[in-house]
Amino acid sequence: LGALVVTTTAAKGAIPETHPLSAGATLELEPTQRVLAAADIVLAVGSELAETSFWTSAASIRLGDQLIRVDIDPAQLVRSFRPDLAILGDAALTMAALTERLAGTPVTGAEERAARLWAENRAEHEVPETMNRCRMLNMLAEYLPENCFISLDSTQVAYTGASYFRIDHPNGWHFPNGFGTLGTGVPTAIGAKLGAPERPAMVIAGDG
């Protein structure tokens, strides 16, 4: 579609965050929320748009002049945010149909907006209170092998990394931000290795 893409933390890496149209899993950050509020249309695909994705109440969030939601579950189509248009269907099939229908429609400026938004959001983290976490995450990005599965406990590095660290492959970041469950990092990584033994795995553990 040629549009700027933002994901929830649960979908982190579903769209490679190194893609020029990606603005990462940054829904909780103020620069992204400004962009969403100013958008003509927000297309939400397969997302419950939960308060845990925004880290604030739904009442304080504005999702564009018009909101279109795509979901295979009728209940999810109206959860948290009531859309202007609800499309009940499989996400992959619906997006393929939309892409075909909109082929040739000129879209300009999205890559520049995504790059600018990445820079603004990273600046939100690169402040004295969180700079040490950013340094650690930048070192990990330099040395981690490709296609690595990262399993995280509910820890400050995870909170920062969810919107700061870039993942360029699906199922590469598992962080229990829904319930904030403690102690899931190691068992989740074990399960990931059992399911995909060819993939390297790393755990970031700790409380607080």
Model regions: which residues?
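Active-site diphosphate/adenylate-binding microenvironment
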Residues: 1, 115-198
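Short gly/pro/ser/thr-enriched loop/turn and capping motifs at secondary-structure boundaries
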Residues: 11-16, 50-51, 74-78, 84, ...
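Structural motif
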Residues: 41, 149, 200-202
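Phosphate/pyrophosphate-binding active-site segments
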Residues: 64-154
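DG-centered beta-turn motif at the end of beta-strands
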Residues: 198-208
